[in-house]
Amino acid sequence: IADEYEIPLVGGDFVRGSLNINVVVYGVPYNNKILKRNGASDGDIICISAPVGSAKKGLEEFQSGIKSSENITNYLRPKPKFNIGKSISEIATSCIDTSDGLLVDLKHILDDSKVGAHIYLDNIPFTTDIEDINAGDDYDLCFTIPENKYEGNFIKIGKVTNNKSIKLISEKGYDVSIKGFKHFQWVAFQTWKNLHIL
């Protein structure tokens, strides 16, 4: 990916763990617009760029001995969503990738924007089951746009509210809680099915 997009790897960071691989990126924003986490406003539509859970499924397939699949490629060699980022740069009010899990990453947007949300679980397409919304490594985008600029070309999963709470809504009876990867905390897991944040 670094060669494809002519990005030299430089930088540093610190984290608890036996192996550290760090990436720092410097650059000029497209159209001088930076999509941040803190711009969501009451009434904005919450969207995602793709179904959730492909990387989780890819990991499961890889561990089961399957050699190649689209899901495995999405897990082992995720592609940055530069074209989508460019296409929403003029209309999105906030944006984040879903590498830590859709719900936990969306919560970053809501917390930083000091807003809440109604999330329509029935609208979220998943690869395996509804727990995919907590699976990480998808590297797709979750973003907010003003309702009057939504044209139906992205997956609409909710709406921003001003009450600073998150309401998960499902007519199908889905019952989930917000989980996902938390940086700088010890995370014990063997497979995605028994991921626990301690």
Where are these regions (language model features)?
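Residue-level signal for inorganic ion chemistry
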Residues: 9, 43, 97, 143, ...
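Active-site-proximal betaalpha loop/short-helix elements
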Residues: 75-138
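Short hydrophobic/aromatic beta-strand micro-patches
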Residues: 26-28, 142-146
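Short, compositionally biased
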Residues: 57-74
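Acidic, Ser/Thr/Pro-rich beta/coil linker or hinge segments at domain junctions
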Residues: 76-79, 151-198
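Glycine-rich anion-binding loops of enzyme active sites
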Residues: 1-61
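Solvent-exposed alpha-helices and their adjacent loops that cap or buttress functional pockets
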Residues: 15-18, 38-41, 65, 86-89, ...
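Short, conserved charged micro-motifs
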Residues: 34, 147-153
